[in-house]
Amino acid sequence: MPDTKKTFNSISRVYNLINNIISLGKHKKWKKRLVLGHAIKGNVLDIATGTGDIVYLIEEYWKESTLYATDPSNKMLEIAIKRNVKENVIFSESYCEDLHFNNSFFDFVTISFGIRNTKSINNALTECKRVMKKGATLKIMEFSKSENIFLSLLTTTYLFLIIPFIGLLFGKFKEYYYLSSSISNFYTPKQFEEILLDSGFKIKEIDTFNLGLVTIYTVTKP
């Protein structure tokens, strides 16, 4: 796996634009789906915050929360901080596997399209659980590997022909080929559910949508 900090620093300036292109603008609706349906009061952490899309949705819908956001890419964080006009979010640079927070600190944790890029998913989940209060919720949104052969073929074609080509147009072929590979190599919803259970979480809901290609996993710390 390449250094994710280096990869995301490299694509930080084109990240939002290319996200809109390759998702056909749908990623904004997906992220809103992650946030809606909750009224959170307390400490909230957005991991792998990137350029801050989830942060701004949380600010809009969870107005009584205290919001923290982390990412390993300092360049992505610079953009997120500039976009944060309310200046009420505590940003910090860290990997998911090494969060700089006390034990049992957060009431709610979110990770949007970031868990697959961790160096160790098991270590990342263990660290998430460490900083969560008992009964706290973790919501992870990630691309899913389809078990439908036809959809799997279409997805593979899109991942390894279309997305890297779009990256190439912006001079970022290597970075977007890696991101396509990380999507292709991720788990089916059932496989990732087992990983979450093995990490000690309690499954609350698994919501798969967009033809089974995106899944939101809602789990709690017992």
Language-model features: where?
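Class I SAM-dependent methyltransferase SAM/SAH-binding core
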Residues: 45-98
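A short glycine-rich, Lys/Arg-flanked "PGG" loop and its adjoining helix->strand segment in the class I
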Residues: 122-137
